[in-house]
Amino acid sequence: MTSLPVTDPAFAADATVEVDDASVWFGQKVALSELACSFGPGVTGLLGPNGAGKSTLMRAVTGLIGVNTGHVRVEGRDPRRDRDVQARIALVPEDEAVPAQLTARELVRYVADLHGVRDPDASERALALVDMLPAADRRLRGFSKGMRQRAKVAAALVTDPPVLVLDEPLNGADPVQRVRLTELFRKLGAEGRTVIVSSHVLSEVERLADRVLVLIHGRLAAAGGHRAIRDAMDDRPRHVLIRADEPRRLGAALLRLGTVAGVSLTDAGLVVTTERAGDLAGAVAPVARELGVRLREVRPLDDSLESLFRELVR
């Protein structure tokens, strides 16, 4: 596993959820290993391959399981033991286990009654937030996977939770609903709620999350904004695509710079490898101008969560 510095230790004064050296194991399997991280207001994306410990962490945060060592605190209290703090956390699980005989409206009202929500309009507001009112009286057994996900999100929101934990909430949603749910989650985070979202669709997390935590083998591999994490990897090669009228001439000139480790000509254009991306960015245009070469595009190839994630799990 690639070892990276944690660029944002995340133990700010406004942290709502704190995980302090928490370990969880099931028999001989270690699911979390001395994990230390925290979550505050806004949206945090939780990334990692299968078996990384994401769902275990979410279950510990919501109090569904305890930790074997260390501590998990939500608003300074133990979510496993404190019923008051449990009521302030809502979970949308990844699994599709829903009472299929209920309608969406009945599901949301059931959750509202279970939590003692007395506002008679709360269920309608929650259904409206996820665009479920037109289908609210249809039974869940007839819903698509994406519609069931939206019904579960509505059920979670009916309690107006300060802490919202979402395990793959966009799974099965159509493109329009993905956009709407993404906007909703960002709005909830902007309101000051702590929103924790796991997803395997890294490009969606990139659009959704203010911060990213990457778990590998139950440990925290990286934390912070994805660009900040990439900046912390400045001792590792980065790749920049340059499209120009005369790529061979430009590549030869760039190779003479101390900022470039290598160049290769591909169908997409000239790919430059560098460990000093900032210096390269400042040098490309002057070199092209001196050569009389027209630049058409200069774009980093590895400045996305997808490429970052691949490098982290190598």
Predicted regions, residues:
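Short alpha-helical
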Residues: 80, 118, 203, 248-249, ...
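ABC transporter nucleotide-binding domains
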Residues: 14-217, 222
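ABC-family P-loop ATPase nucleotide-binding domain
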Residues: 1-23, 314
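Short, flexible cytosolic linker that couples an ABC transmembrane/permease module to its adjacent nucleotide-binding
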Residues: 2-9, 125, 225-231
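C-terminal coupling/interaction segments
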Residues: 2-7, 276-314
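Residue-level "edge-of-site" marker
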Residues: 125, 140, 267-268, 301
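ABC transporter nucleotide-binding domain
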Residues: 182-274
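Hydrophobic/anchoring residues in structured secondary elements
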Residues: 37, 262-265, 298-300
